[in-house]
Amino acid sequence: MTQEPLIAIVGPTAVGKTALGIELAKTFGAEIISGDSMQVYRTMDIGTAKATVEEMAGIPHHLIDILEPGDTWTVSMFQEKALLAIASIRSRGKWPLLVGGTGLYVQALTHELSFGDAPSDSSFREEMELYASRFGNAALHGKLAKADPNAAEAIHANNVRRVIRALEVIHLTGKPFSEQENGLARPRFDNVLIGLEMERQALYERINRRVDAMMEAGLLEEVHRLYQRGIQGQAIQAIGYKELYAYFDGKCTYDEAIEALKTNSRRYAKRQLTWFKNRSDAVWFHLEEPEAKAKIFDYVHAFLAGKGFA
């Protein structure tokens, strides 16, 4: 582990990570690295809740709008690009602030993931390879989604080798692959994880309102443009896109698509919160408390002062 600081803001979708990250970056001289697995895609702006240029307030943001929607993006690709971004940020005398929602992506940067000591089972791998050849990559990926939704979110269906490895580790250990990742990894930096949370019903209402706001802002049109271009694959599996694709395919009504979008967003928020509560040493701040934001700023200032950044 290096003594270089890395602060990450984590927590469920719609809790307010983006806005807080920008405020912290402006106050303490940081540049932001997006830990969201879908904000890398150009033209997918509304559904991924990207900050607008105005909201960014001149703060450099990294790993946003770097790929076309048809391109593949993996945990390892994120790790490589994020480490390069950190080196670049530090060369300018700034410090990196990771703002993320995808658990494995955050862990891939904060920790040195290693599976060299994990067990193996060649017969199980052969069985899974046969399954994929018979039923397809999506069916194999579906197995992982049932066993470990967090791992499935981070591993693309076409990365068959990685999917099989995840299933193999689950098969042999009885534990989620995503849990193994963190358990076998050492911290890469002097990490500080700031967890944001609020009362669950308040968060769910906030999610529902954000979905309504996204629709008013033009999410239907944004997704329809992708649909007309014939975009398939990883990008359109994101929440907000897959539900509206189903509507355009005639598989559900408009109202059913919106309700599915809200339901899936709430479920995702619950998974995110569970992930970070169980798999990280984040310091949690309840945003409904009056002094929560002031406490966060004091906490960050004290940490950076100890590192010579404040």
Curated annotation (Swiss-Prot):
Site, Interaction with substrate tRNA: residue positions: 102, 125
Class of this enzyme: transferase
Assigned keywords, A-Z: ATP-binding, Magnesium, Nucleotide-binding, Transferase, tRNA processing
Pfam families on file: IPPT
EC number: 2.5.1.75
Superkingdom: Bacteria
GO biological process: tRNA modification
Positions of ATP binding: 11-18
GO MF annotations in UniProt: ATP binding; tRNA dimethylallyltransferase activity
Task of the protein: Catalyzes the transfer of a dimethylallyl group onto the adenine at position 37 in tRNAs that read codons beginning with uridine, leading to the formation of N6-(dimethylallyl)adenosine (i(6)A).
Similarity-based family: Belongs to the IPP transferase family.
Subunit organization: Monomer.
NCBIfam families, A to Z: miaA (TIGR00174)
Name of the protein: tRNA dimethylallyltransferase
